[in-house]
């Protein structure tokens, strides 16, 4: 294995408590607007299924998108694998059920008019087969004519090898910095993210390692189509990587 592979060998896609604790603050400082992102999804759904009444947000994270979704749909639910992220979501939207589960094999036993998988969560799947498991499971939980929305990670031709970026957030009594460095290895991007948190009790830092698959547009589309979801790719918004929007046959 290469040095990069050795570093990432034990990487988990489940967010740690340290990461969950500062997630909203640092990504808000980076320009994320969850209400606006959710609003864009609502508009896309409205043009395809104006009568939609229920929505499931898989890999819902801290529940930031659910705050907007709950104002738009009669029935809203979330799904999250990380205990730390799920606990924040439960506090944020206590009236919304937040289920624990893996996006590849969860079973809620009921259909939804809309299912969203945002924040490039599908790219944490290591293989195309796992990506297809995700889309098949989404299709199983979609009502006929229901709408699926997936936000991808970068396509292989758009990824910048060696990309670095940074941000600083001032949040209450805390100052949080984030530095990241991403490299290409095979069909994946491997990102090292270093955080420093300064707070009244002192300064602490920690490092996260993230592996994200560089699936192609065709691979996402085929995974959706083969699951029985007619899909189209809409480039650009909300975060530069676009969205896949599909309707279940």
Swiss-Prot record:
Binding site for S-adenosyl-L-methionine: 59, 80, 102-103
Entry keyword annotation includes S-adenosyl-L-methionine: yes
Cofactors demanded by this protein: Mg(2+)
EC number: 2.1.1.324
Highest taxon in the source lineage: Bacteria
Residues annotated to bind substrate: 30, 165, 178-182, 241
Top enzyme class: transferase
BP GO terms, sorted: methylation
Keywords: Magnesium, Metal-binding, Methyltransferase, S-adenosyl-L-methionine, Transferase
Single GO molecular function: metal ion binding
Catalytic reaction annotation: dTDP-4-amino-2,3,4,6-tetradeoxy-alpha-D-erythro-hexopyranose + 2 S-adenosyl-L-methionine = dTDP-alpha-D-forosamine + 2 S-adenosyl-L-homocysteine + 2 H(+)
InterPro entries recorded: Methyltransf_25 (IPR041698), Methyltransf_Superfamily (IPR050508), SAM-dependent_MTases_sf (IPR029063)
Residues in the signal sequence: none
Summary of the function given for this chain in its UniProt record: Involved in the biosynthesis of forosamine ((4-dimethylamino)-2,3,4,6-tetradeoxy-alpha-D-threo-hexopyranose), a highly deoxygenated sugar component of several bioactive natural products such as the insecticidal spinosyns A and D.
Subunit structure, as described in the record: Homodimer.
Name by which UniProt lists this protein: dTDP-4-amino-2,3,4,6-tetradeoxy-D-glucose N,N-dimethyltransferase
Highest classification ranks of the organism: Bacteria, Bacillati, Actinomycetota, Actinomycetes, Pseudonocardiales
